[in-house]
Each structure stands twice: as C-alpha cells, then as structure tokens.
Curated annotation (Swiss-Prot):
GO terms for cellular component: cell envelope Sec protein transport complex; cytosol; plasma membrane. The keyword Membrane applies. Its EC number is 7.4.2.8. It comes from Shigella flexneri. Zn(2+) binds at C885, C887, C896, H897. It catalyses: ATP + H2O + cellular proteinSide 1 = ADP + phosphate + cellular proteinSide 2. This is Protein translocase subunit SecA. It is found in: Cell inner membrane; Cytoplasm. ATP binds at Q87, G105, E106, G107, K108, T109, D512. Residues 859-891 are annotated as: Disordered. It is a peripheral membrane protein.
Length: 901
C-alpha cells in the first residue's frame, strides 16, 4: 500500500527516467532551427568535429543533444523522415545500457540510428544485431545512405563471407549482422593460427534488435563449432527398428489407458523413461537383433553407449514431431525454431538426437560431432563493454534482463495512443470445435473487408488451419518455415482489405503490416514507374487504407496460447500500430499443449461443472486467470533453467576466457622461446620428481624407470646409471641440472640445423596446436561431468559446488598436460639439413618410378596401364602431407619435416 502511494506521488522509476530524458529532448528540439540552417557540407562536418572533441577528452554523453539533432536533420534530408520525440527518448535509453520497450510500428529501426551514430564516433565499432540475415541486410541497406551522408562507414556481416570481406565489415564504423554470425566469428577468431586470420575487433557496443528473442528465447542454445567424431550411423538404424514395438505409458485416468506401457513421457521436462516392462522387452529385442548378448543388462557399464542410442531413439519417436519440431527437406532434417517458427539451417541437436531423428525419417545419417569451441549467447553478449537492446515486449522479462545482463528495462511511450481492442479468450472442449469457430470468425471479418492475421505455434497447425480455409473456399496466404522465401512480401500485404494470412508464431517480425497493403511494394514491382503511376498507386492505397480502418483495422487470431505471455503479446502487437484501429482474440481448446500439460484438470473440471455442450465456448475471468497462471508457471520454470545453465556455463566461461586470453597473447608474439624454457624446467622437474623424490635416499630412486621415460617421452638417451657409477659425488641436485642441461643442448643442436627463425615459428605452432587439442578434449570431459553431476545431490552434496571443484581440478590438470605435451613434441621432433631431405626425396622418387615401370611391364591391359600411369604421376610429385616422412622417422610428413616448411 505504501509503495503504491509513493509511486503515485513520485512516479515509478520508468516515469522518473523518462522525465529526466524529456528535458534533453527539449534541448534537441530547440537546436532544430539551428540545424536546418546548416548546409549539407556543414552538417557532414559535424562528425569530424564530434570526433575531435572526444579526442580532447570530452565525455560521449555530453554530445547527445547535438549528435541526436544532427542525425534527425540528416534523416530529414536523406529519407524525408523526422525522428519523433519518443524515438529520441528511445535513442537515449539505448545509449544508457538499457532495454527500450517500443511497440510494433514505432520505428525501432530509425530509433537505432541515433545511438549507433553516437557510439560510432568513438571509432571502436558498433555491432547492430538482428535475428536473421534478411533483416541485417535490409536495415544495413536502408540506413547506409544516412550514415554515409554523415561520413560513417557501414558493413554487413553475413554467413559464408570470406575472411577479408568479414574483416572489412568489422572494420566499418557500424556493422550489421545476426547474433549467430557474431558469436561464431568470435569462436573462429579464437581458433585462428595467425593474427591475420582474426576478423573481429575488441567488442565495444552491441545494439540488439528483438533483444528478447536473442537474449532470452535463444539463451539456452549454445553456439558450437564442431568437428566430426567417429561414425556410428549403423547403430542408429538398428536401434530405430526396435522402437516402434514399444507402447507408450498413458495416465491411469485417461481414456486410452491399457495397463503398464513400455516407456513414460514427461512433456514438461522433455524426457522419456523406460518402465520395468519396457526394459525387459527392449533387452529381448536387442538380443534378437544381435546387438546385445543373451543374459546381458542394458544398464551394465559395457552397454553405456547402447543405452545412449536407445534413449536418443525413444526421444526422437516420442517427443519430436515432423512439421512441428523439424521439417524434412531435400533429404535433410532441419530444426524449426520453437520461438519464431523459422528453420535453422546448419543447426543440429546434440547427444545423438539429430542422428536418431534422421534414422526415424529414413534420411542419410550424418556423423556425430565433437565440440571444438562453444559459447552461450548469455556469455557472448556479456563480453561487450556496452550492451543495449530494443523490442516490442520486454517488460514481462524485465527481472531476467536485470538479474542476468544487468540491463534495466524502460517502457517508451507510443507516439499515438493505443486503441486496439484485446478481446477475452474463448475456450472450447476440442480442437475441431475451436478450428470451426476460427473459420466462422474469419468469414465474418473478411465479409466486411477486415484483414485477418492468424498466428499458429507450429507448421503442422498452420497447415491444418490452411486446409480448413481451403475447404471453406477462403483465399489465404501461408507463412511458415517451409515457405519463408517470400516472407517480407506476404507480411507487407497482410493489411490488404479482406486478406487472410496464416503465420507460424512470429514469422515476419521486423516487417510492418500497413493497413491497406504496402504501396511501396507495388511501386517496386514496376519497371521504371512514372510519377503518374506512383500517384495513382498512392491514391488507390489511401482508399484501401480508409476502408480497412472503417472495417475495424487488422484483426489478430491466436489459435492457441504460447507458453510465454511475451510471445502472445508479440502476436497481438502486429495490430494497432501508430494508433491504428485493430482487434485481437485467442481461441483455445482443452487439447492444446499448454492446457493439457499445465492447466487441464482444473479448467476441464470447471467446464464440465458448467455443463458445456459441444461447440460452446467458455469466456470467464476464472479461465483466463488459470491460463495466465499456467503461463507464469512455464515462464518461471524456463527462467530457472536459463539461470541454472548460466551458473554452470559461468564456470566454463572463466576457463574459456583464460584459455582464449592466453591463446591471443600467444598469437600476438613472434618469439615464445622464453616461455618454452620456463615450461621445460617445470616439466623436467615434475618428471624427475616422479622417479627421484626430492631430498630422498638413493635407494629410493628408480633410475631405470627414469631413463626409459626420458627416452620414450623426450627422445633423450642418457646413461644416468653409468654417471652414478663413475661419479659417486654426483648428488640429486647436480643430477637434475645435468639432465636439464643435456635436453637444452640437444634442442639447441636442432635449432642450429633449421635456424632460430624457423624454430621460433615451429614452437609457436606446436603450442597452439597442443592447446587447441587439449581444450577440445577438456570441453568433452566438462560436458560428461555436467551431464552426471546432478547425481551428487543424492550424496547430500551441492551439484554446482561439486561441478566447480571438479572442473577446476580438470582445468589445472589440462594446463599441466599442455606443458608436458609441448615439451615432449618439441623434444621428439627430428630435424635434417634441407640437402638431406632433398636427397631422400630424390631416392623416393626414383624408387617410385622404378616400381611404376615394373608395373607397366608386368600388366599390359588398359586398367593396369592406367594404374601404372597414375603411379608414375604419383612418383613425380613432392612428398604429400599425409605420406611417411622421407627422414625415416615413421611419422607422417606433416607431423615431422612438413611442420618445418
């Protein structure tokens, strides 16, 4: 009560922030007449003036009024568009490391030009982050004329671009790209083998469009760069044949209950578990198929990989549905983003799940992958010095933005008051009744010329509604992951009178639905349109626009509630832009996923008590409240999952930063010999300690073991036993010094052969390769640790603390292994004079030619002649990277002398 009273008197935090910023808006508005008087050249010259002021030590925030006034004036001259006062407010919010909640149609793209220009003045680079390539390209091309008018450069960062083009894009003042591409470039830069291969600069300022989609919906998705692991595709096929024999366990109170099934499904946690009966059956089937031996248990340690295959296959069949979770296109399983409904080309599920789905669908099974580098979006975006974002719906997630990213949310008021009518939900008993009611609503709306946008949560549902509309003879457009090529064009015309558009989730975000359709799209479709044609198109559009407003504006129909209120609000937000008329309504049934999992028992009981007849809908505050509670439950659960993921990833993140920092330092120096010398001392001390314990009696020394270890691991053949026999005065300390001195002497002789410069280059290469190899293995080990750590809870131990403790021990062990591997590799490398290598290669070539001639003489048929010709050709060439090294070491050329090339 007291808080409410204080808020009424002093205003909320949001009100106070906006009040403070409105004073700056008044200053910007006062500067407008002065800016209008400037010539184009004088306006352009302001950029150089601002940069000079920053160099002299002026604070960036002091430039806000004048810089924003310059951008507003430039926009008027270049685009003929003037930033509204609310857009200036939005620009200031974005500069203050906050999330700006701006409703759909309020001009977020134009708002972003203000903080982007201001922060680009520092010369450190601005990254504008969008959800897909189309929006990145569109926004970059749309805003390029404005930024170039003001003397700034603009780059676009797209997947598949060559490294020089990416480097150029990142070197620009303002770079547009997708969240995935920025993250992958960061990982690739930290796998580079020379400073020239890196493309990104230091991460300075990120301006994230649709920030809720990227920082919340995708927060659980780690970005992973992977390499191929061993092939086990045959096992996926064999296990896949067994799964259809298993029966799902139904709830005892359900109509389909037939006694105990073989596996149970937990839809909340997306897990599948075998029952006792299921375990017996699956073991029988595995024995029958010859996959497992008679009398063996599926849970025995020897069958742990088989258990992994069975679990993956069960999940693929029970939890993942075609045209909902994925689509099959051109013989490939492509994941569908659960939040946007878009396909995610190139993304794959982990833990063998993707291979299990491929086996289920009968398409080619691709190899499992091993992680080489990974990072979550949560940790990638926290690397920026300054982070801000904008979206139409952030307020429901304000707590998460604040607790995880330290970003406050500021709700920016609309330019014109919102007049959209949000009608109460209608709940039906069955899905068929709900679909029928939706069709009737669409018929009524289109009859009076009102456009309708139907939002579905999956491709399957969008096609179901589409089929029903086709049966009813209603023309419509379908917008889902299968047909997203024309996405922007379809969305742009979704406001046409009586147009019906079915969109999966939030497909088409970022494109405004203009009432009456888009006249710009009509003009763009014409070749060299005349002024008269353009005027006629505009006049026709105005008539259509007025007709749609008269009919009630755009009507939104939600075919079911999403598990997040925010995504429902995004769908509603497509209507009522810029103060336009509009309406929205959600249609639900007791068969919807959200209702079935989270709200079914209570609500269906309520509906039965009310004595509902088939086809009747319930519209009651209790039901709406029950649904809102169900959504809150899911949101809270998802937040906990994301928070927990972050807590675990933070452990890996500290290690990642340490490794990447060390790696970058290594890349930037040309001489690592001092580091190598220091490491050598540590490694030899630890190795000798294992056989000659410090300050121990000679009887405790294991000299034969030490000699063997030095020979095997460091290629040092030292007569230590002989030394000790001949020199009784040789004590522990001098022996240690002599072994180390011998290893240094042998190494220096190698250096004299190849030269210091070549040796420094080789040392750096070995350190980088060894670091990458061990980091890759460490990531896999961390992954295994993470998967089983929750079991420590049964031993009354905190899994998070145990994970921190064990991962730290593993990391320390990895760093010790790094030192050992580097010194071992450098010690064992064989070097020869270039003349010796050439002589050996000449001998090899002559031998190959001799064999080829013998082959030609002994076989005269075409095939063997072709083979001999090929052998002769092979003999002519230089040593291949994977051929045995001519020095006779038995190693591959690339791992021996090829390393010194």
């Amino acid at each position: 009560m007291l808080i409410k009273l204080l808020t009424k008197v002093f205003g909320s935090r949001n009100d106070r922030t906006l009040r403070r910023m409105r004073k700056v808006v008044n200053i910007i508005n006062a500067m407008e007449p002065e800016m209008e008087k400037l010539s184009d050249e004088e306006l352009k010259g302001k950029t150089a003036e601002f940069r000079a002021r920053l160099e002299k030590g002026e604070v960036l925030e002091n430039l806000i009024p004048e810089a924003f006034a310059v951008v507003r004036e430039a926009s008027k001259r270049v685009f003929g568009m003037r930033h509204f006062d609310v857009q200036l407010l939005g620009g200031m919010v974005l500069n203050e490391r906050c999330i700006a909640e701006m409703r759909t149609g309020e001009g977020k793209t134009l708002t972003a030009t203000l903080p982007a220009y201001l922060n680009a003045l520092t010369g450190k680079g601005v990254h504008v982050v969008t959800v897909n390539d189309y929006l990145a390209q569109r926004d970059a091309e749309n805003n390029r004329p404005l930024f170039e008018f003001l003397g700034l450069t603009v780059g676009i960062n797209l997947p598949g671009m060559p490294a020089p083009a990416k480097r150029e894009a990142y070197a620009a003042d303002i770079t547009y790209g997708t969240n995935n591409e920025y993250g992958f470039d960061y990982l690739r830069d930290n796998m580079a083998f020379s400073p020239e291969e890196r493309v990104q600069r230091k991460l300075h300022y990120a301006l994230v469009d649709e920030v809720d989609s990227i920082l919340i919906d995708e927060a659980r998705t780690p970005l992973i760069i992977s390499g191929p692991a061993e092939d086990s595709s045959e096992m996926y096929k064999r296990v896949n044949k067994i799964i259809p024999h298993l029966i799902r366990q139904e709830k005892e109170d359900s109509e389909t209950f037939q006694g105990e099934g073989h596996f149970s499904v937990d839809e909340k946690s997306r897990q599948v578990n075998l029952t006792e009966r299921g375990l017996v059956l699956i073991e029988e089937l595995l024995v029958k198929e010859g996959i497992m031996d008679e009398g063996e248990s599926l849970y025995s340690p020897a069958n742990i990989m088989l258990m992994h295959h069975v679990t993956a296959a069960l999940r693929a069949h029970a939890l993942f549905t075609r045209d909902v979770d994925y689509i099959v296109k051109d013989g490939e399983v492509i994941i569908v983003d659960e939040h946007t409904g878009r396909t995610m080309q190139g993304r794959r599920w982990s833990d063998g799940l993707h291979q299990a789905v491929e086996a289920k669908e009968g398409v080619q099974i691709q190899n499992e992958n091993q992680t080489l580098a990974s990072i979550t979006f949560q940790n990638y975006f926290r690397l920026y010095e300054k982070l801000a974002g904008m979206t139409g719906t952030a307020d429901t997630e304000a707590f998460e933005f604040s607790s995880i990213y330290k970003l406050d949310t500021v709700v920016v008021p609309t330019n014109r008051p919102m007049i959209r009518k949000d009608l109460p939900d209608l709940v039906y008993m069955t899905e068929a009744e709900k679909i029928q009611a939706i069709i009737e609503d669409i018929k009524e709306r289109t009859a009076k010329g009102q456009p309708v946008l139907v939002g579905t949560i999956s491709i399957e549902k969008s096609e179901l509604v589409s089929n029903e509309l086709t049966k009813a003879g209603i023309k419509h457009n379908v917008l889902n992951a299968k047909f997203h090529a024309n996405e922007a064009a379809i969305v742009a015309q979704a406001g046409y009178p009586a147009a019906v558009t079915i969109a999966t989730n939030m497909a088409g975000r970022g494109t405004d639905i203009v009432l009456g359709g888009s006249w710009q799209a009509e003009v763009a479709a014409l070749e060299n349109p005349t002024a008269e044609q353009i005027e006629k198109i505009k006049a026709d559009w105005q008539v259509r626009h007025d007709a749609v407003l008269e009919a009630g504006g755009l009507h939104i129909i939600g075919t079911e509630r999403h598990e997040s209120r925010r995504i429902d609000n995004q769908l509603r937000g497509r209507s009522g832009r810029q103060g336009d008329a509009g309406s929205s309504r959600f249609y639900l049934s007791m068969e919807d996923a959200l209702m079935r999992i989270f709200a079914s028992d209570r609500v269906s009981g309520m509906m039965r008590k009310l004595g509902m007849k088939p086809g009747e809908a319930i519209e009651h505050p209790w039901v709406t409240k029950a649904i809102a509670n169900a959504q809150r439950k899911v949101e809270s659960r998802n937040f906990d999952i994301r928070k927990q993921l972050l807590e675990y990833d933070d452990v890996a993140n500290d290690q990642r930063r340490a490794i990447y920092s060390q790696r970058n330092e290594l890349l930037d120096v040309s001489d690592v010999s001092e580091t190598i010398n220091s490491i050598r001392e540590d490694v030899f001390k630890a190795t000798i300690d294992a056989y000659i314990p410090p300050q121990s009696l000679e009887e405790m020394w294991d000299i034969p073991g030490l000699q063997e270890r030095l020979k095997n691991d460091f290629d040092l053949d030292l007569p230590i036993t002989e030394w000790l026999d001949k020199e009784p005065e040789l004590h522990e300390e001098t022996l240690r010094e002599r072994i180390l001195a011998q290893s240094i002497e042998v190494y220096q002789r190698k250096e004299e052969v190849v030269g210091a410069e070549m040796m420094r280059h080789f040392e750096k290469g070995v350190m980088l390769q060894t670091l990458d190899s061990l980091w890759k293995e460490h990531l896999a080990a961390m992954d295994y640790l993470r998967q089983g750590i929750h079991l420590r809870g049964y031993a009354q131990k905190d899994p998070k603390q145990e994970y921190k403790r064990e991962s730290f021990s593993m990391f320390a062990a990895m760093l010790e292994s790094l030192k050992y591997e580097v010194i071992s590799t450098l010690s064992k490398v064989q070097v020869r004079m270039p003349e010796e290598v050439e002589e050996l290669e000449q001998q090899r070539r002559m031998e190959a030619e001799r064999l080829a001639q013998m082959q030609q003489l002994s076989h005269q048929d075409d095939d063997s002649a072709a083979a001999a010709a090929l052998a002769a050709q092979t003999g002519e060439r230089k040593v291949g990277r994977n051929d045995p090294c001519p020095c006779g070491s038995g190693k591959k050329y690339k791992q021996c002398h090829g390393r010194l090339q």
